[in-house]
Amino acid sequence: MAKEISSELLNTILTRVGGPGNIASCGNCMTRLRLGVHDSSLVDPNIKTLEGVKGVILTSDQVQVVFGPGKAHRAAKAMSELLGEAPVQDAAEIAAQNKRQLKAKQTSGVQQFLAKFATIFTPLIPGFIAAGLLLGIATLIATVMHVPADAQGTLPDALNFMKVFSKGLFTFLVILVGYNAAQAFGGTGVNGAIIAALFLLGYNPAATTGYYAGFHDFFGLPIDPRGNIIGVLIAAWACARIEGMVRRFMPDDLDMLLTSLITLLITATLAYLIIMPLGGWLFEGMSWLFMHLNSNPFGCAVLAGLFLIAVVFGVHQGFIPVYLALMDSQGFNSLFPILSMAGAGQVGAALALYWRAQPHSALRSQVRGAIIPGLLGVGEPLIYGVTLPRMKPFVTACLGGAAGGLFIGLIAWWGLPMGLNSAFGPSGLVALPLMTSAQGILPAMAVYAGGILVAWVCGFIFTTLFGCRNVNLD
């Protein structure tokens, strides 16, 4: 295990969050150890001063400790082992003692709902990145070497092999989402997966593709399984709630036999009658909104400028359903490269701070340690170690990101919309081969690279002019 996540560090963190008895859950996203807590008043915010911790985000019921990619997973695994070995106090007693205080501090329902997306989508992100990279590399090779789509031979076969993972992922993605969502909302994962599969089946007996469900209407009512991801999330939530209500009244002897059976029958009925049409309308509305924002340069600037703030509050995972909706409606994720400009603006701001700092200052050392991850799309080290503690550079970094978003929005407005070839992927320079557009991969890569350059330069200029005044540069 790396030094930064040693058992001593994790024991110190465990002590500062109130001990094992205050831990309700332990998990991780790509860069953060996420600890659910019963009583937030027991949490010491000075966790962020520990060596190896890049930042801390506190909510009423969760502590997010920023370690960075890879390390967060190891930290969560080691913390789970520590919790398994530690003597645990009565969690229910702790919760009861502090219930009133927790209610007073409770964050909004919207923020809590968005936090669920981390639980649903984080396990899928490595697959998104891997499949997207393989597809991007294969598409780039085919473009540069002028390989026709119907070509035969070793190279075309190898390229098709690299592309098949993306096809498999997005064909059956709703089942994975349904499974994770049902669990996140407190239900049984397999029930969510089965309900999600209803959105994947075909209901047109004359169709030549897909798998026919065996009926084309629901007791005479038409079936319209549009709005895949949005509908699946709603259905998984309903499935978990219905399962909880059924289990409450089900005798223990019949629980395994009847609970899932009744849950599936009720949820499927609701899905066909209400959730599928509702999901379709929400899907169309969300797609319309973000497609129009993407085609509006100023809308792109606002989205890119505000994204770092979403990262700070830990609700940036809430954009993932939007990514999936855009993939369905556009064929690529046009929002992701716009939001990626936020990280590029921060790189420019960090370089300006490095330039203005004293040669042997701690600030220069902090920037050197965080700039490479920032260039590769991992922004937390720069956020929590460099810009956010000084505030003004954080604001100018947001302005630099907004300038990059404005650039991409202008290019789209002039007739070259582009986006990521996957619902999710790496940002920064690593994302270059994942860009695509109707005009091909190379124009999309050029637009993305131009946006990054604009964000770097503007972040640097804004920070040099406005972000260094009355700021500690030591």
Curated annotation (Swiss-Prot):
GO CC field: membrane; plasma membrane
EC number: 2.7.1.192
Major localization listed first in the record, in broad terms: membrane
CDD domains per the UniProt record, alphabetical: PTS_IIB_glc (cd00212)
SUPFAM superfamilies recorded: Glucose permease domain IIB (SSF55604)
Keyword Kinase: yes
GO MF assignments: kinase activity; protein-N(PI)-phosphohistidine-sugar phosphotransferase activity; protein-phosphocysteine-N-acetylmuramate phosphotransferase system transporter activity
Span of domain PTS EIIC type-1: 115-474
Top-level division of the source organism's lineage: Bacteria
Periplasmic side: 145-157, 202-217, 282-301, 356-368, 415-440
Gene3D superfamilies recorded: Glucose permease domain IIB
Keywords annotated in UniProt: Cell inner membrane, Cell membrane, Kinase, Membrane, Phosphotransferase system, Sugar transport, Transferase, Transmembrane, Transmembrane helix, Transport
Reactions it catalyzes: N-acetyl-beta-D-muramate(out) + N(pros)-phospho-L-histidyl-[protein] = N-acetyl-beta-D-muramate 6-phosphate(in) + L-histidyl-[protein]
Any one Gene Ontology BP term: phosphoenolpyruvate-dependent sugar phosphotransferase system
Domain PTS EIIB type-1: start-end pairs: 1-89
Membrane topology: Multi-pass membrane protein
Transmembrane segments: 124-144, 158-178, 181-201, 218-238, 261-281, 302-322, 335-355, 369-389, 394-414, 441-461
Pfam families, alphabetized: PTS_EIIB, PTS_EIIC
Active site positions: 29 (phosphocysteine intermediate)
Cytoplasmic side: 1-123, 179-180, 239-260, 323-334, 390-393, 462-474
Induction, as annotated: Induced by MurNAc 6-phosphate that releases the repressor MurR from the DNA. Also up-regulated by the cAMP receptor protein crp via the binding of crp-cAMP to a class I site upstream of the murQ promoter. Repressed by MurR in the absence of MurNAc 6-phosphate.
Note, other: The PTS domain EIIA required for activity was shown to be the crr-encoded enzyme IIA-glucose, EIIA-Glc.
Function summary: The phosphoenolpyruvate-dependent sugar phosphotransferase system (sugar PTS), a major carbohydrate active transport system, catalyzes the phosphorylation of incoming sugar substrates concomitantly with their translocation across the cell membrane. This system is involved in N-acetylmuramic acid (MurNAc) transport, yielding cytoplasmic MurNAc-6-P. Is responsible for growth on MurNAc as the sole source of carbon and energy. Is also able to take up anhydro-N-acetylmuramic acid (anhMurNAc), but cannot phosphorylate the carbon 6, probably because of the 1,6-anhydro ring.
Descriptive protein name: PTS system N-acetylmuramic acid-specific EIIBC component
Annotated source species: Escherichia coli (strain K12)
